């Protein structure tokens, strides 16, 4: 079997993207890094996004940190998801930054969250810390769109959370709000403040927030598609 090679340009079809992702299944991160001419860090403490960057290189992703999807031409977002030995997610999944101002007229249908989750290529990766980073294997990919029930679940949480933001209650939002979708601070340091609406409608400064999918949502999603018991 010939070794896979990174895509040098963005994939032109979903089929090409999925076929390339399937070729990576079973390889370790160390093997994929070496084949791409990259050095594998000892751990992810200083390189938190390294796995995502590695897989973006292999799959020809184009967006980087821009607001559009990773595969903008296909409308597909790439999400790597660390899993345990039973294939269950080990952490929540970042979706996008939560807008804290300028939200008048925004609906679920036009929201950034829905745009990012419209079509997702999920790639599970072994994530248990007992496995050295270079030895963690890449799992089988899944190309997913939310079904009617999943869309409803996400919409209800999004509407509840956005109502709180618009009504000046952003500081009262905790990770427990939302059944499947949560908002929590997203900042490398506590000095990175952004504008938001306060309880009396005034402008306040607060930590940037991000939308995250809770583990119960991604766990059910993976279990249903991979028949994990």
From Swiss-Prot:
Task: Using the record, list the residue span of the signal peptide; answer none if the entry has no such feature.
Answer: none
- Name the Gene3D superfamilies on file: DNA mismatch repair MutH/Restriction endonuclease, type II (3.40.600.10)
Q: Where in the cell is it found?
A: Cytoplasm
UniProt-listed GO biological process terms: DNA modification; mismatch repair
Q: Which CDD domains match?
A: MutH-like (cd00583)
User: What Pfam families does the database record attribute to this sequence?
Assistant: MutH
Give the UniProt keywords, A-Z.
Cytoplasm, DNA damage, DNA repair, Endonuclease, Hydrolase, Nuclease
* Keyword presence, DNA damage: yes
**Carries keyword Nucleotide-binding?**
no
Entry GO terms, CC: cytoplasm
Just give the chief location class.
cytoplasm
One GO MF annotation is: endonuclease activity
Q: Give the record's family classification.
A: Belongs to the MutH family.
Q: What is the role of the protein in this entry?
A: Sequence-specific endonuclease that cleaves unmethylated GATC sequences. It is involved in DNA mismatch repair.
Annotated NCBIfam families: mutH_TIGR, PRK05070.1
> What protein name does the entry list?
DNA mismatch repair protein MutH
């Amino acid at each position: 079997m010939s070794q896979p090679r990174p895509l040098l340009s963005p994939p032109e079809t979903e089929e090409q993207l999925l076929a390339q992702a399937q070729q990576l299944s079973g390889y370790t991160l160390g093997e994929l890094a070496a084949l791409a001419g990259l050095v594998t860090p000892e751990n992810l403490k200083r390189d938190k996004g390294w796995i995502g960057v590695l897989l973006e290189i292999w799959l020809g992703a184009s967006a980087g940190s821009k607001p559009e999807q990773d595969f903008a031409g296909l409308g597909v977002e790439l999400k790597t998801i660390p899993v345990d030995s039973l294939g269950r997610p080990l952490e929540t999944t970042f979706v996008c930054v939560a807008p804290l101002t300028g939200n008048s007229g925004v609906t679920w249908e036009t929201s950034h969250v829905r745009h990012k989750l419209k079509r997702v290529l999920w790639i599970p990766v072994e994530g248990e810390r007992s496995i050295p980073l270079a030895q963690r294997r890449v799992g089988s990919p899944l190309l997913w769109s939310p079904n009617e029930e999943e869309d409803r679940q996400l919409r209800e949480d999004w509407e509840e959370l956005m109502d709180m933001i618009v009504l000046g209650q952003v500081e009262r939002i905790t990770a427990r709000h939302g059944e499947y979708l949560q908002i929590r601070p997203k900042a490398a340091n506590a000095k990175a403040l952004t504008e938001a609406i306060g309880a009396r409608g005034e402008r306040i400064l607060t930590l940037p927030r991000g939308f995250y999918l809770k583990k119960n949502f991604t766990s059910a999603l993976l279990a249903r598609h991979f028949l994990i018991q």
